[in-house]
Amino acid sequence: MFAPLLKKLFGSKNERDVKRMAKAVQAINALEPQMVALSDEQLKAKTAEFQQRYAKGETLDQLLPEAFAVVREAGKRVMGMRHFDVQLIGGMTLHDGKIAEMRTGEGKTLVGTLPVYLNALSGKGVHVVTVNDYLARRDANWMRPLYEFLGLSVGVVTPFQPPEDKRAAYAADITYGTNNEFGFDYLRDNMAFSLDDKFQRELNFAVVDEVDSILIDEARTPLIISGQAEDSSELYIKINKLIPRLKRQVEEVEGKPTEEGHYSIDEKTRQVELNEQGHQFIEDLLSQNGLLGEGESLYSAHNLSLLTHVYAALRAHTLFHRNVEYIVQGDQILLIDEHTGRTMPGRRLSEGLHQAIEAKEGLPIQAESQTLASTTFQNYFRLYNKLAGMTGTADTEAFEFRQIYGLDVVVIPTHRPIARKDFNDLVYLTQEEKYAAIITDIKQCQALGRPILVGTASIESSEYVSKLLQEAGIEHKVLNAKYHEKEAEIIAQAGAPGSVTIATNMAGRGTDILLGGNWEVEVAALENPTEEQIAQIKAEWQKRHQQVIEAGGLHVIASERHESRRIDNQLRGRAGRQGDPGSSRFYLSLEDNLMRIFASDRVKNFMKALGMQSGEAIEHRMVTNAIEKAQRKVEGRNFDIRKQLLEFDDVANEQRKVIYHMRNTLLSAEDVGETIKEFREETLSATINQHIPPQSLPEQWDIEGLEAALYSDFAVRLPIQQWLDEDDKLYEETLRSKILEQIVAAYYEKEELAGAEALRAFEKQMLLRVLDDLWKDHLSTMDHLRHGIHLRGYAQKNPKQEYKRESFTLFQELLDSIKRDTIRVLSHVQVRREDPAEEEARLRREAEELAKRMQFQHAEAPSMEQAVAGEEEELPEGPAPVVPLEPVRNEQKIGRNEPCPCGSGKKYKHCHGQLD
């Protein structure tokens, strides 16, 4: 009630933030004359001065005005570009660890230089994160002269980079790379066999470009490093042949089936379910083909993997379509990013789904994989001490940024007012009518000499529009996942007079469309251009630029609405950069996916009430509101799925932190002898307790079992029964001490034979190997637990609570297994006198061989949707309030007497800290 009045009196929080930073801008501007007066050498020397002042105790906030003024002056001298006042505000926003929303063409890349330079002065490194390798290399090469002028080093991390190059890139003051590469390197570092093999140092400060794409769109898909598992290619091929015989159950609006079938599809959640008839039918087919035993059920425990294969094949046939969700290139399935329209080489779907699609398309089936290490972007980026981001569209997701990452969004004012006209949506009855209207609009704009950008949601629709334009005799360029190698070239000239460019979603994001085309690309195409040629190209471009401005600027046409308003806003934002004129229009039909699934009934009834005829369009605010309501509903659902993924991964993340902390402690330890001693005593105590319960009578003792267990665990044969027969006074406590003495003595004999140094090195390497093998198996067990946990909802149990409880039990078992298996291996193995360096080199060679066989997946997470479906009654209509999660600090130390972070209630030293 009072919010509008308070906002009117005091301004919005965003306005107050901008006003506060505007005062700091005045201080930076006041320093400009001083900086202009400095020679190049004096300006360069400022970096060393700032570093010394920081070392003596000045904070980065205190250095900010001078540092920003230095970067602004260096930008003028090195690149001929001066930071605008609004760009300084953007730089301060990023330094504060917030998200800066800046419109297309406002110079986000240049803005990033300000906080990156300032934070690099600390010597702890800064990571600049981009969405693809092309942008990482482009931005690094573009800004490198500026940073190097100021005495800072720049590195770029890329896939398949030689280890020494990657290490050098991470050691640089500023490191550019993609979100995937930073995440995978973090996982690889935690699989290293020595500290020298690690790449990353402390995760200090990250500036994430296109932050919405990385932290929102990519948040549902975990990063996975996997190795090959068993080969099931024949099974995929056999089941693939059976799926086309299943029929879909078609339903009316009232929910009654019009045609009996075997499965139903829920397009809202992208789930497919077999019905009772479907289960019986597929069981009969599997039995006939020898895949299921006579009279056996598909739901028997030993047939569950077969059921997984059936569902994977069913999803591949019904939910994944060629040229929409993926393309076939050679003998590979390349997934398409639904948000950018780009292919994602190397990314594979999990749970056998990728293999099922390969079988569907008749391609060679690659072996299934086993998870070796995994994390999510949500948990990886929260490891940084400070996180900031830039994007053209973040305000619609401000709630999620705040709740999940603790990041505020600040909308930065534009340098010049936006002159773009956003027309109301036009809604048609059919897609055919919609596309006809789009072609008419293109012809009209082209006649005026305006450049046109047509945004489509899939390769299929982009090729359909292309076909219609060919039939109409209109010259055009197509930019989709099939032709992505021409992306920069096509986008560069998309602003030429009368040019028509078709792009799937936001392909080309990160490259501005300049009105009149890009004269720099024309110059770059010439070999050794002269000053006269460059001047002529500039003059011709200036004419074209003016011609396009007078015609009305770039016109953006969208062929349908995306699930997210943010993606729609990104497409609109291609027009009207830096105050240029432009316009945008969305063309929709009731047959579009979003309209058909979420909004069609209300709009269809409205159109019928108006008596709409074929070919007519409706343009009304009520229709636009209905569509936006549908989008908000989808956004709310997607937010809940991401939130569910985070809540589930947070459980695994606590365990991951404990294991990785333990691993790093082992790597940095010179000697793990004390740890092995503790393991030996605890394992022995557990073994004896199993056969001689504490405070029990001798009649209850299982001496024969104890002798066998001691040989199994410690490779020592002890005549315990003989001891007891010979000594009546050998009680429980004295017996325990005697057994321990014998086991320790046997181990010391081994040490004398092998040599203390060799055994210490072997202990360390073996402990690492046991830890890695058991952690890998634990990840697989956790995957299976997570995929089936939603079924607990049917037993009136909370799946999340059950997952937390059972995963804690599994983790306790993992810790016990690490101790027991390490002692068992060390007791049984014969250690040769070998140079520890040779042993480490051998293990490193084995690790390198493993690395060659690794697959790096950024896989889908359908199980989270199932988890959501299992708790559907709990989900609110829109985004639900959640408790803000504190960023996880990379160097955080947990006190041994503090409560364990896993939530068990025990002290850390008696729980997950007992292996440190």
UniProtKB/Swiss-Prot annotation:
GO aspect biological process, one term: intracellular protein transmembrane transport
Record region (Disordered): 857-916
Binding-site positions, Zn(2+): C900, C902, C911, H912
Enzyme class, spelled out: translocase
Binding residue positions for ATP: Q87, G105, E106, G107, K108, T109, D512
SUPFAM superfamilies assigned to the protein according to its UniProt record, in alphabetical order: Helical scaffold and wing domains of SecA, P-loop containing nucleoside triphosphate hydrolases, Pre-protein crosslinking domain of SecA
Comp. bias regions, Basic residues: 906-916
Protein keywords: ATP-binding, Cell inner membrane, Cell membrane, Cytoplasm, Membrane, Metal-binding, Nucleotide-binding, Protein transport, Translocase, Translocation, Transport, Zinc
Entry-linked Gene3D superfamilies: Helical scaffold and wing domains of SecA, P-loop containing nucleotide triphosphate hydrolases, SecA, preprotein cross-linking domain
GO MF terms, alphabetically ordered: ATP binding; metal ion binding; protein-exporting ATPase activity
Membrane topology: Peripheral membrane protein
Pfam families: P-loop_SecA, SEC-C, SecA_DEAD, SecA_PP_bind, SecA_SW
Chief place of localization: membrane
InterPro entries xrefs: Helicase_ATP-bd, Helicase_C-like, P-loop_NTPase, SEC_C_motif, SecA, SecA_CS, SecA_DEAD, SecA_motor_DEAD
Catalytic activity, reaction form: ATP + H2O + cellular proteinSide 1 = ADP + phosphate + cellular proteinSide 2
PROSITE patterns noted in UniProt: SECA, SECA_MOTOR_DEAD
GO CC terms, sorted: cell envelope Sec protein transport complex; cytoplasm; plasma membrane
EC number assigned by the record: 7.4.2.8
Compartmental location: Cell inner membrane; Cytoplasm
Cofactor note: May bind 1 zinc ion per subunit.
Requisite cofactors: Zn(2+)
HAMAP family on file: SecA
Protein family per UniProt: Belongs to the SecA family.
Complex and partners: Monomer and homodimer. Part of the essential Sec protein translocation apparatus which comprises SecA, SecYEG and auxiliary proteins SecDF-YajC and YidC.
Its biological purpose: Part of the Sec protein translocase complex. Interacts with the SecYEG preprotein conducting channel. Has a central role in coupling the hydrolysis of ATP to the transfer of proteins into and across the cell membrane, serving both as a receptor for the preprotein-SecB complex and as an ATP-driven molecular motor driving the stepwise translocation of polypeptide chains across the membrane.
Protein name: Protein translocase subunit SecA
